[in-house]
């Protein structure tokens, strides 16, 4: 439950973990704490539920203060541990019969059975190309049994060829959708499925430092306007955003998750509905409803919510998450938040030696001629990371590449060495033939 002002962190039934009538709890999400603080709220509620109590700071201690079951833990950052009092409480509670339900495995949920035909390889399935209509690998995979046919190596996936063979290692299987914030993934030669998506760590600077990468895309305000209103449109001024997002009307909303009107607070004006300058003075939209606002002699464009939805459920009428809203700040869920890097330990300058950037797995995405995982110099390396599936950066592959390059170089060098010799020989033959022809003509005279 979200609460703007904190009066309590939640409610649960202390020590009633195995009581089916009370095995529940409710936690609050105060405005002034981040995800780390919320995780402590949940941890403390679970602790109370299994019989722990709040620590007495005078009698309880832990290796690094504050301890988990202390109220101060909600507002502090960094690793935390349980105190000696919490360990004692748990040992005492676990020794009683009140926790015997934890040893009862009769009600453990069984893994979901695989469903043949849903396009997802599960359980004992060898392949799953979808139902009869969807299956594009009918020569490779039996869509009714999800078993491979004959000698087929694969029967589904982006790294499976029409000949039922695994794609060669290094074959691109997912192209980058953004030149700065997303990366191409490759088949690894051993799986028919592409590796998980890799992209720049959220908060990485793009567009010459004017925007942030977020979820694999450079969230530049101008790009969002171009996608809605066409080439030439640009992000509007602060005055336009204030006009569009501060009025109390049905179409002024800083919270796209709710159906009611919620004008933006002053600090969140740039994170509400998207406001853009028109591409040109004669701009008219024939494909969608456009709202026109006039501010200080400028025309600001916006659209009503719900008319331009993305495949991920987000509404293009609103500023995208990750868009800059101030110095070291970007928009998250309609609010202007400080860019927070406390959740990752990847420092590109140190970990990648300045020869790459951090990706969403916290690993280095190296520039060309630098080899992962540490981005050490290696001429000929395609760069990338240990996560993108490209195995063609191994020592043997690079050695083969260099030998091939050297062989080509020797062929070219040999050609240029022997070319003058061949030309000299050819010219000599021509001269000799000319000398033979001249005496014959003199004898004929």
Curated annotation (Swiss-Prot):
UniProt-annotated location(s): Membrane
Post-translational modifications: The prodomain and the metalloprotease-like domain are cleaved during the epididymal maturation of the spermatozoa.
UniProt topological domain (Extracellular) ranges: 1-409
Domain Disintegrin: 113-202
Record-annotated Peptidase M12B domain positions: 1-106
One MF term in the entry's GO annotations: metalloendopeptidase activity
Pfam families linked to this entry: ADAM_CR, Disintegrin, Reprolysin
GO CC annotation, single: membrane
Disulphide linkage map: 18-101, 60-85, 62-67, 173-194, 346-358, 352-364, 366-375
Gene Ontology biological-process entries: cell differentiation; proteolysis; spermatogenesis
The entry's keywords: Developmental protein, Differentiation, Disulfide bond, EGF-like domain, Glycoprotein, Membrane, Spermatogenesis, Transmembrane, Transmembrane helix
Domain EGF-like: 342-376
Domain notes: A tripeptide motif (ECD) within disintegrin-like domain could be involved in the binding to egg integrin receptor and thus could mediate sperm/egg binding.
Function: Sperm surface membrane protein that may be involved in spermatogenesis and fertilization. This is a non catalytic metalloprotease-like protein.
Name of the protein: Disintegrin and metalloproteinase domain-containing protein 18
Gene label: Adam18
């Amino acid at each position: 439950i979200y609460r703007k002002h904190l009066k309590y962190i939640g409610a649960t039934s202390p020590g009633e973990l195995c009581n089916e009538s009370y095995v529940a709890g409710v936690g609050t999400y105060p405005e002034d704490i981040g995800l780390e603080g919320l995780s402590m709220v949940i941890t403390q509620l679970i602790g109370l539920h299994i019989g722990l109590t709040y620590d007495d700071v005078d009698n309880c201690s832990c290796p690094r203060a504050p301890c988990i079951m202390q109220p101060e833990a909600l507002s502090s950052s960094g690793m935390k541990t349980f105190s000696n009092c919490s360990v004692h409480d748990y040992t005492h509670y676990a020794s009683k019969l009140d926790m015997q339900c934890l040893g009862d495995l009769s009600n453990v949920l069984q893994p979901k059975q695989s469903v043949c035909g849903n396009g997802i390889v599960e359980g004992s399935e060898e392949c799953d190309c979808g139902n009869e209509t969807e299956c594009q690998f009918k020569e490779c995979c039996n869509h009714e049994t999800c078993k491979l046919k004959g000698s087929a190596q694969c029967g589904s996936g982006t790294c499976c060829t029409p000949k039922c063979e695994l794609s060669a290692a290094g074959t691109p299987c997912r192209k980058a959708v953004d030149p700065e914030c997303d990366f191409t993934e490759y088949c690894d030669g051993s799986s028919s499925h592409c590796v998980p998506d890799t992209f720049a760590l959220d908060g990485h600077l793009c567009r010459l430092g004017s925007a942030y990468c977020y979820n694999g895309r450079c969230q530049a305000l101008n790009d969002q306007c171009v996608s809605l209103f066409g080439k030439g449109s640009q992000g509007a001024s602060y005055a336009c955003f204030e006009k569009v997002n501060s009025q109390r009307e049905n179409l002024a909303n800083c919270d796209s998750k709710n159906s009611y009107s919620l004008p933006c607070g002053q600090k969140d004006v740039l994170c509400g509905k998207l406001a853009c300058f028109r591409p040109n003075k004669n701009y008219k939209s024939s494909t969608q409803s456009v709202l026109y606002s006039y501010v200080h002699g400028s025309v600001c464009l916006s659209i009503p919510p719900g008319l331009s939805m993305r495949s991920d459920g987000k509404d293009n009428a609103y500023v995208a998450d990750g868009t800059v809203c101030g110095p070291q700040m970007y928009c998250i869920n309609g609010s202007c938040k400080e860019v927070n890097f406390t959740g990752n330990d990847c420092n590109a300058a140190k970990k990648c030696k300045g020869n790459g950037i951090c990706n969403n797995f916290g690993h280095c995405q190296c520039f060309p001629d630098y080899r992962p995982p540490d981005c050490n110099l290696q001429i000929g390396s395609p760069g990338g990371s240990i996560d993108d599936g490209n195995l063609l950066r191994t020592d043997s592959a690079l050695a083969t590449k260099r030998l091939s390059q050297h062989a080509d170089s020797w062929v070219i060098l040999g050609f240029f060495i022997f070319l003058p010799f061949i030309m000299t020989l050819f010219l000599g033959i021509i001269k000799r033939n000319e000398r033979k022809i001249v005496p014959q003509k003199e004898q004929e005279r």
